[in-house]
Regions:
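A short pocket-lining beta-strand/turn micro-motif at the edge of beta-sheets
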Residues: 61-63, 104, 159-161
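Basic/polar, cationic surfaces and motifs that engage anionic cell-wall
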Residues: 68-157, 194
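Active-site-adjacent loop/helix surface patches within enzyme catalytic domains
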Residues: 1-99
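Solvent-exposed beta-strand motifs enriched in subsets of small alpha/beta binding domains
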Residues: 151-194
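Short glycine-rich loop/turn motifs that provide flexible caps or phosphate-binding loops at active sites
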Residues: 2, 107, 165
Length: 194
């Protein structure tokens, strides 16, 4: 569950194992049971997620996210996070004009290790096959979603898509988050009361 670390994998620590680490996002179950993506870094910031290898570091070249493995054998949970991850990658490929099927665009941690740009870690190669999936089927799913989502470019320059970073019942908490978001460079951020 996002915000909870019952599996002792230590992402929720300041410096797990003495290392400073941070992925760009987590995908997992919320307290209400739904699956969501929780962004922890702006997409254009360098993360500290994959380590390095003999040919450099995936941290310098890739956006990363961690899929919380709440239930390695729970098919419903797997399908929900797999779908969420595919939708996230679809959005990122669209945003950055990337071909999900191009070599090295979407890789698992273990594939980064094989390329010499990441530490030796199995994700998601140990989990996807348990549910009949692979990184190849994942990339194909992203390509399918990307093709389905392609729509004619709007000529209306005033159409905006907004991204919400939180919902708070205490105004002081909303003010604190707004301050953090603006400090991170998002100067047009604002609070909307509803």
């Amino acid at each position: 569950m996002l915000g909870k670390n019952q599996y002792n994998n230590h992402w929720n620590q300041d410096k797990p194992g003495g290392r400073q680490v941070c992925v760009h996002a987590f995908i997992g179950k919320l307290a209400n049971g739904t699956v969501a993506t929780y962004q922890t870094l702006p997409w254009n910031h360098r993360g500290w997620h994959g380590g390095s290898g003999s040919k450099g570091s995936v941290n310098d070249t890739h956006i990363s996210f961690e899929i919380c493995e709440d239930g390695l054998t729970d098919a419903a949970y797997f399908n929900a996070v797999y779908k969420e991850a595919a939708e996230l990658c679809t959005c990122l490929c669209k945003e950055y004009k990337l071909d999900p099927m191009a070599d090295g665009v979407i890789i698992g941690h273990y594939e980064g290790h094989k390329r010499g740009i990441a530490s030796n870690h199995a994700d998601p190669g140990h989990w996807f096959p348990k549910h009949g999936k692979s990184m190849d089927t994942f990339r194909a799913e992203v390509e399918k979603l990307l093709s389905a989502n392609e729509a004619p470019t709007s000529t209306d320059p005033k159409k905006l898509y907004r991204v919400q970073v939180g919902a708070y019942s205490v105004k002081a908490n909303a003010d604190a988050m707004l301050k953090k978001v603006k400090a991170a460079g998002f100067k047009d951020a604002f609070i909307k009361y509803s």
